[in-house]
From Swiss-Prot:
Compartments where located: Cytoplasm
Protein name, entry field: Thiazole synthase
GO cellular component, one term: cytoplasm
GO molecular function, one term: thiazole synthase activity
GO BP of this protein: thiamine diphosphate biosynthetic process
Lineage: Bacteria, Pseudomonadati, Pseudomonadota, Gammaproteobacteria, Alteromonadales
Annotated source species: Shewanella halifaxensis (strain HAW-EB4)
CDD domains recorded: ThiG
Gene name tied to this protein: thiG
Chain positions recorded as 1-deoxy-D-xylulose 5-phosphate binding sites: 156, 182-183, 204-205
């Protein structure tokens, strides 16, 4: 069971709502993935009604919503988006995203840390999306973030765990849940992230862009469970040398 800010999740697969061809496909794929936390961009919401056509169906399925500040370019815009989401959705949970570069969507570490500090002081449950920077993740933990969400590779790239070396350090040092976010493009990559000791993964593009998002959602659910079970069971040590698993020639010397 994964606990974030006193909220428990049985599933360690978190999902997104973007890039699906249709809302019905998205809802069915999320259900197939067994995800219990779904992130959605605040900019998708209707400012007049505080919802969009997927909000109620998600809530009806018992999914916890994690609004995100995607599109925010600085501290001011991110805080405004967080305030807006709390007013519209009645939640103090926020996925903090600040990426001023529209081409590569790299998160701004300086603006993110400052926004996280302010939002934590205001009582938000902050889950920041950041580079796989162990020092930054430690600082975010110190200002009160409920979890950290380091990227595996650029958003939507499906490149997998390009930052594996740094993810290992973050996982080793963290005292809050580590959720690998962005770049996971295949179920095998999600399994590997969980084998490293990640507490959860967030997957969107790999499911939404699949030719069969519903089937892919099921695949990711199985992959995450397998990776977690392998981590708990304990993986064997990696060696650069061969080690025999049974005696090779000892019996030849017996008389």
């Amino acid at each position: 069971m994964l606990t974030i800010a006193q909220h428990q999740f049985e599933s360690r697969l978190f999902t997104g709502t973007g890039k699906f061809a249709a809302s019905e496909i998205m809802l069915t794929a999320i259900q197939a993935s067994q995800s219990q936390l779904v992130t959605l961009a605040i900019k998708r919401l209707d400012l007049k009604t505080g919802s969009d056509n997927i909000l109620k169906p998600l809530l009806d399925r018992g999914v916890k919503l994690l609004p995100n500040t995607a599109g925010a370019r600085n501290v001011k815009e991110a805080i405004f988006a967080a305030h807006l989401s709390r007013e519209m959705l009645g939640t103090n949970w926020i996925k903090l995203e600040i990426h001023p570069d529209p081409k590569y969507l790299m998160p701004d570490p300086i603006e993110t840390l400052e926004a996280a500090r302010i939002l934590c002081e205001q009582g938000y449950v902050v889950l920041p999306y950041v580079h796989a920077d162990p020092v930054l993740c430690r600082r975010l933990e110190e200002v009160g973030c409920a979890a950290v969400m380091p990227l595996g590779s650029p958003i939507g790239s499906n490149q997998g765990l390009a930052t594996e070396t740094f993810l290992k350090i973050i996982i080793e040092q963290a005292n809050v849940p580590v959720i690998v976010d962005a770049g996971i493009g295949a179920p095998s990559q999600a399994t590997h992230a969980m084998e490293l000791g990640a507490d959860a993964v967030l997957v969107n593009t790999a499911i939404a862009s699949s030719s069969d998002p519903v089937a892919m959602g099921r695949c990711f659910a199985q992959a995450v469970n397998t990776g977690r079970q392998a981590y708990v069971a304990g993986l064997g040590a990696v060696s650069h040398q061969a080690h025999n698993t049974s005696p090779l020639t000892g019996f030849l010397n017996d008389e």
